């Protein structure tokens, strides 16, 4: 087939994809209206039933807590006097924390670019080693495989163990799951709470499963039960697991809202709420779902945590509306979008976008033959149709590749991710469904086959490499289609002390806009999931 025919075929595919997106958008709109109508009919009855159930639970809970205080008052007093850090009644800094020289604390904060906004002026010092914190044995034993707490863990744990609301602003791969997971599980074991008390919301199925896996590791050998709730699989199995007595639920917003509207899940006993990748959830249009979920949990007695890679106005407003004097812990300068300086960024400007596929093959051959030949490589396509085409191209060129995109079932995506993590396959092809939050260790190379729709997504893609203190390389193909992002890309490169190609400067500093030459204003619909809006 000639190059002209190929070009026409691609243009036809792109136009066809746009029509599919428009149709899907209208369908989603209609489904949303139907769901809203259904919800309004059920609201009055559910509100009354929920209030009665909530009042009854709170009354029983207060009664149990009063009995517990009567039975164990002397033990709590003794525990405090011996500097036990975590009980169900608060946190006390140990002598080991107090004995750390202030110069060492200052160096830790400076080296890791840590800032803490502490509205209640608690002035808790960071936990620099695991022997400085007293946790339940079943929890502390799971931490021995790590050398020391990560910065976000070091600084946030004291506040979280004291029951304070916390906002954590840090890059992905910073240890956020254990930052909120360790206090959550420790509190459940300490209080012997049998109710559903911990809820973690995340933007994608893959991230929800990853968090679930980490919490499962943390709870192994205990009576604490975790359940993952996400779209693309049967609701019935998930409902059954919740009703069998879950203590912790990790969920995507769309599926959880479905279960709430169906009356299949009761969140009235939640006392520890985590919003992970909050900025990403708002970008994906989950704001109303998040508000509904938060409104289904108790307003009083709830500890709320929010973790985010950036701190835009929308995230700040969410924190102001639903959090109580939160402590804000920031790792690095996250107010301004920036890339990890440990990542080498290579931007290759192409005059002809149809060169990308040939260049990708050459690049993969080069990187796979570097070192021991076992480097993990992550290739990003923009949308699922492109990913499917590139997957076929790589197979034809004898590459062993795993793939994650919207045309695959949840089982296929999970298997692909596991294959990549385990090293069975060292090449993963993904759309932006995998761009945030996923903990894929030891990714050496990220290749941006097609530049993403926003500069934020570019930075998020880069974050798949250079994790946990390691270095990485990001190779990006840039074409005239993305020239409106050239100015923002130049800023990111300069901010990370990376060279700016002369060919990129020719496009000048265009104003950023979240559109695409094919999809236009439908950019948010790119790579829609199989059966619901969460990926």
Curated annotation (Swiss-Prot):
Residues annotated as binding ATP: 170-177
GO biological process, one term: rRNA processing
Keyword Manganese: no
Short sequence motif named Q motif, residue ranges: 128-154
Biased composition annotated in UniProt, kind: Basic residues: 35-54
A molecular function (GO) term: ATP hydrolysis activity
Keywords: ATP-binding, Helicase, Hydrolase, Nucleotide-binding, Nucleus, Ribosome biogenesis, RNA-binding, rRNA processing
Helicase C-terminal domain location: 362-508
GO CC aspect terms: nucleolus
Keyword Nucleus: yes
UniProt-listed PROSITE patterns: DEAD_ATP_HELICASE, HELICASE_ATP_BIND_1, HELICASE_CTER, Q_MOTIF
Region entry Disordered, spans: 1-96
UniProt-annotated location(s): Nucleus, Nucleolus
Ranges of residues in domain Helicase ATP-binding: 157-329
Segments carrying motif DEAD box: 276-279
Reactions catalysed: ATP + H2O = ADP + phosphate + H(+)
Biased composition (Basic and acidic residues): 1-21, 55-72
E.C. numbers: 3.6.4.13
Low complexity biased stretches: 79-88
Family according to the record: Belongs to the DEAD box helicase family. DDX5/DBP2 subfamily.
The record's note on its domains: The Q motif is unique to and characteristic of the DEAD box family of RNA helicases and controls ATP binding and hydrolysis.
Role summary: ATP-dependent RNA helicase required for 60S ribosomal subunit synthesis. Involved in efficient pre-rRNA processing, predominantly at site A3, which is necessary for the normal formation of 25S and 5.8S rRNAs.
Protein's name in the database: ATP-dependent RNA helicase DBP3
The organism of origin for this protein: Lodderomyces elongisporus (strain ATCC 11503 / CBS 2605 / JCM 1781 / NBRC 1676 / NRRL YB-4239) (Yeast)
Lineage: Eukaryota, Fungi, Dikarya, Ascomycota, Saccharomycotina
């Amino acid at each position: 087939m000639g190059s002209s025919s190929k070009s026409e075929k691609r243009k036809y595919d792109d136009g066809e994809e746009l029509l599919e997106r428009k149709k899907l958008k209208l369908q989603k709109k209609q489904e949303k209206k139907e769901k809203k109508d259904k919800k309004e009919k059920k609201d009055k009855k559910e509100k009354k039933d929920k209030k009665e159930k909530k009042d009854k639970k709170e009354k029983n809970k207060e009664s149990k807590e009063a009995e517990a205080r009567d039975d164990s008052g002397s033990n709590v007093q003794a525990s405090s006097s011996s500097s036990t850090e975590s009980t169900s009644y608060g946190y006390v800094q140990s002598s080991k924390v107090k004995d750390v020289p202030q110069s060492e604390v200052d160096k830790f904060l400076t080296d890791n670019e840590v800032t803490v906004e502490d509205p209640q002026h608690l002035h808790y010092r960071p936990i620099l080693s695991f022997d400085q914190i007293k946790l339940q044995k079943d929890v502390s034993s799971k931490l021995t495989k790590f050398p020391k707490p990560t910065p976000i863990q070091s600084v946030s744990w004291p506040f979280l163990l004291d029951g304070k609301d916390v906002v954590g602003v840090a890059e992905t791969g910073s240890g956020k799951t254990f930052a909120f997971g360790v206090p959550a599980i420790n509190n459940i074991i300490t209080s012997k709470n049998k109710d559903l008390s911990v809820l973690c919301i995340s933007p994608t199925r893959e991230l929800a499963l990853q968090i679930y896996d980490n919490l499962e590791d943390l709870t192994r050998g205990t009576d604490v039960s975790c359940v993952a709730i996400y779209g693309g699989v049967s609701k019935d199995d998930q409902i059954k697991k919740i009703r069998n007595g879950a203590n912790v639920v990790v969920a995507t917003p769309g599926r959880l809202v479905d279960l709430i509207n169906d009356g299949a899940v009761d969140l009235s006993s939640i006392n520890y709420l985590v919003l992970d990748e909050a900025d990403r959830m708002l970008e994906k249009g989950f704001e109303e779902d998040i508000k509904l979920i938060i409104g289904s949990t108790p307003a009083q007695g709830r500890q709320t945590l929010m973790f985010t890679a950036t701190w835009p106005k929308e995230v700040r407003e969410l924190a102001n509306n639903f959090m109580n004097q939160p402590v804000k812990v920031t790792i690095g300068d996250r107010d301004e979008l920036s890339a990890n300086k440990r990542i080498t960024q290579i931007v290759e400007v192409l005059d002809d976008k149809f060169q990308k596929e040939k260049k990708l093959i050459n690049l993969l051959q080069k990187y796979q033959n570097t070192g021991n030949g076992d480097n993990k490589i992550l290739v990003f396509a923009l949308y699922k149709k492109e990913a499917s085409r590139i997957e076929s191209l790589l197979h034809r060129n004898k590459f062993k590749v795993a793939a994650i995109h919207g045309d695959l079932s949840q089982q296929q995506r999970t298997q692909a991710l596991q294959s990549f993590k385990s090293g069975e396959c060292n090449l993963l092809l993904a759309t932006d469904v995998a761009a945030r939050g996923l903990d894929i260790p030891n990714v050496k190379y990220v290749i941006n086959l097609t530049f993403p729709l926003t500069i934020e997504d570019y930075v998020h893609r880069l974050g798949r490499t250079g994790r946990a203190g390691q270095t990485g390389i990001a190779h990006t193909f840039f074409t005239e289609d993305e020239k409106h992002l050239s100015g923002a890309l130049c800023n990111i490169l300069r901010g990370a002390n990376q060279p700016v190609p002369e060919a990129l400067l020719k496009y000048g500093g265009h104003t950023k806009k979240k559109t695409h030459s094919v999809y236009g204003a439908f950019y948010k619909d790119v790579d829609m999931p199989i059966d619901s809006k969460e990926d």
